[in-house]
Amino acid sequence: CEILFIGAKGKMEMEKVPKAGYQIKGLPISGIDRGNLLSNLSFPLKLQKSLKLAKKILKEFKPDIAIGTGGFASGPLLWQASKQGIPVVIQEQNSFPGITNKLLKNRAEAICVAYEGISQFPAEKVHYTGNPIRSEIFKNLSNREQAIHSYGLDPEKKTILSIGGSQGSRTLNNAWKSDLKKLQDVGVQLIWQTGKLDFDKIKTELDGDLKGIHITEFIYDMKTAFSAADLIVSRAGAMAISELSLVGKPLI
């Protein structure tokens, strides 16, 4: 089975997908900024370019099916796929659908939902599947002591894992910064995923004071991170909730 991912140029997926071993092509698309209407003036041009490029990609790759999860790039790609007679499936990760999936609902052959009772889609197309999760993460978690050693931390101390999501969480980051000394004073360690935007700033502000702290912008090996944690504090993204519900660790 050959898989080609389509993402939005300049977004995180353009870096992360190749690192996971898959091909990806980018579309020059962005979301609509409801808080700054002037920033949306270029959206029609970006959409037009993305539709044209999506059409070209589909003709070259010739997929048997096109699957979208509601991101920026899903719109142009799935719209063109449906026009070319390629079966379209959309997957809605949240309890309330986003704008892209709502616009595509009539062009999809099937709509896979994470939660029951979503009324915004045609009932005859809806399949209650739950969210897809990486099951290998939860099978036989690594040895806690070895996992903590891999982060350069002390297995004798309690360890918190902080997950800010793919983009990071500024709210979480600011909370940890303000109370970091308290953690260090009571001997609690922190594996801190900051996200890319805040990583350099936080590292500079800490100025080498990293006793009992492992700081990283992104975590690729979630199995080891979960294994090391005594407590997990996480941003409540749709996929995060689905996966963390199976970890079996105390969770905030």
Where do the model's predicted regions map?
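An amphipathic, basic-hydrophobic alpha-helix
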Residues: 36-65
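Short loop/helix-cap segments at secondary-structure boundaries that form the rim of catalytic
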Residues: 15-19, 102-104, 117-126, 201-209, ...
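An aromatic- and histidine-rich active-site surface loop
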Residues: 11-15, 63-84
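Conserved nucleotide-sugar phosphate-binding/catalytic loop shared by glycosyltransferases and other
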Residues: 2-46, 196-198
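Conserved donor-binding/catalytic loop of nucleotide-activated donor transferases
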Residues: 84, 227-229, 243-251
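Active-site-proximal region of nucleotide-activated glycan assembly enzymes
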Residues: 2, 12, 23, 82-145, ...
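Donor-nucleotide binding loops and adjacent catalytic segments primarily
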Residues: 20, 142-149, 153-231, 241
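Alpha-helix C-terminal capping/helix-to-coil transition sites in glycosyltransferase folds
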Residues: 60-62, 106-107, 221-228, 246
